[in-house]
Amino acid sequence: MKNLVLGCFEGFNATILAYGQTGSGKTFTMGSGYTIGLSREDIGLIPRVIEFIFQEVEARKQKAEFIIKCSFLEIYNEELHDLLEEGNSTMMDRIMPAKKEISIREEKNGTISVYGLKEVTVKSGEEMAACLDSGSSQRITSSTMMNA
């Protein structure tokens, strides 16, 4: 994980993807569930990445200025959902959105860009963790035959 984050400071993109069947521990492993009250050993990957990002910002702040923006995208049944957009918390809001459309596009140079996604400027790990908690509370969850 640290090498991926360090690569971002050098201008590279990085992605960590959790994929698996229902109940396999993706949310727990990534740490996008509520982390309040969990021990240091039990927090997931995302809170650890947040902590490391801000450690690196602190170590490098004499050489560069940093602006960190946070967004939270959910892809559910091939539909894109902005989890930081206010008023996006109910299933009805998602079925009949009154907001701008989110799209993912490949640019001419091959980079992938997301348009229409809310970005929140954060100045600390605590602010970024608050975005994570806020967005996590808006994720779509539903039972499947695996839960039965």
Regions found by a protein language model. Name each.
Residues M1-Q21, G31-A148:
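P-loop NTPase "switch/coupling" elements that transmit nucleotide state to mechanical/effector output
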Residues K26:
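Conserved lysine of the Walker
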